[in-house]
Amino acid sequence: PTRRSSDLPLWEVVHLPEASDPDWTEYDVFEWNVYGSIQNMAENGVDVAHFKYIHGTANVPLGELRWGEWGRGADVFAKMGTPWGEVDGSICYDTMGPGQSWTRFGGISETLLVACITPVELDHVHVRFCFTQPKSQANGERAGVAKAIIRDICKQFDQDKVVWDRMKYEPNALICEGDGPIAQFRKFYARYYVSEGGDNNVTPLKAAG
């Protein structure tokens, strides 16, 4: 969006160096249609509790949130199970505006996921996941592990989709302390709507009850 129709965009599209690095693979693309709202999908990123109870991580991961003027992100660290035991994994995601999203996965096999999220209707979103990995990992002796990472990420999206396709947006949701900073996120996300005015004053989450 712009401040007025004649103005320049309010933010620039972020360049991802891996996307043009000859040492990284071409994109491997997967597509879905999600029958829910783009905001419900976005809130998934700050709902840290769901990683354990929906995706089966070994614990509820700790996230370090970042808030910018038009972008946001988080670094989530969690134990990940592998055939060689648990390893320290990282999931670092960032967004610019409501539609540009990318996630870097580390710990098992380096992976960059570029998510192209396009609202079709109020409760219909078309999603493309574009994956790239270092060629040395994707084609090396652990190529099977690299491919398994992509399969697992897509499996997790399928798990989330079961919820999103049945999820109603609740403007006055009852939030518990362990749910993640949903309140801060909603205040931040309001800046993307024409009829709503957001700002950078992100206040601490107050638990319900």
Language-model segments: residues:
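Short, small-residue-biased leader/transition segments that mark boundaries at the very start
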Residues: 1-5
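C-terminal catalytic domain of Rieske-type non-heme iron oxygenases
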Residues: 9-209
